[in-house]
């Protein structure tokens, strides 16, 4: 398969797909962490032009240079035979991942993925970097596992920055509540925006 790759949306006709071309570093050891990083960041689907742009941005920040990355359509006959194909689902998973897991010696271990995630993260602008807790897991913890007094790091969807807060209470329906919005007009116990189910978060301690 070589070390070139074409990363394209799993949806639709392969012959008409806009995707990202990698001239080097196209093996699973590079591509898997890059795709996982985009999932962690919560980017729009890869089938959306915005998703393609975000992946290219992350790659450009990480690899640098001027010649290794391109945005292009698949050739009329589909993905070129000398390019490793990666079909990306709308939730940022590699649809044909089992092929590489079984047959590619470059398939990375969990430790290697985490190490590269940290390298990718450090290469991004400081304001865009994510906390280590998010790099360690792409899944939000079960709300029922969160306890009063625990510290969580969460993504503020308005300002798109990561913040920390302490769980202040558990609502009657079992949803943890923070105390980040509080005013005489709308006390924190009544403000729906304090409910943790509305955020992407990880438990710090």
Where would I find each of the regions flagged by the language model?
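Short beta-strand scaffold segments in enzyme catalytic cores
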Residues: 4-9
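Short, solvent-exposed aromatic-acidic interface loops
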Residues: 18-29, 182-184
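Low-complexity intrinsically disordered segments
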Residues: 38-136
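Mixed-charge, Lys/Arg-rich low-complexity intrinsically disordered regions
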Residues: 134-148
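Intrinsically disordered, low-complexity, charged/polar segments
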Residues: 139, 180-205
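Short beta-strand-centered aromatic/proline hotspots
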Residues: 161-171
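Short aromatic-glycine-enriched beta-strand elements
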Residues: 175-179
């Amino acid at each position: 398969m070589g070390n070139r790759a074409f990363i394209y949306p799993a949806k639709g006709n392969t012959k008409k797909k806009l995707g990202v071309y990698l001239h080097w570093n196209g093996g699973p050891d590079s591509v898997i962490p890059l795709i996982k990083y985009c999932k962690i960041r919560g980017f729009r689907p890869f089938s959306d032009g915005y998703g393609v742009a975000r992946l290219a941005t992350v790659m450009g920040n990480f690899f640098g240079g001027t010649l290794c990355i391109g945005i292009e359509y698949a050739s009329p006959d589909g993905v070129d035979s000398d390019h490793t194909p990666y079909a990306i689902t709308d939730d940022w998973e590699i649809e044909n991942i089992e092929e590489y897991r079984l047959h590619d010696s470059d398939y990375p271990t969990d430790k290697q993925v985490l190490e590269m995630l940290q390298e990718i993260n450090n290469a991004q602008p400081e304001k865009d970097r994510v906390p280590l807790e998010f790099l360690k897991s792409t899944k939000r913890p079960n709300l029922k596992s969160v306890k009063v007094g625990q510290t969580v790091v969460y993504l503020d969807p308005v300002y798109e920055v990561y913040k920390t807060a302490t769980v202040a209470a558990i609502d009657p329906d079992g949803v943890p509540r923070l105390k980040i919005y509080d005013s005489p007009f709308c006390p924190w116990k009544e403000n729906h925006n304090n409910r943790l189910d509305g955020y992407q978060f990880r438990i710090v301690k």
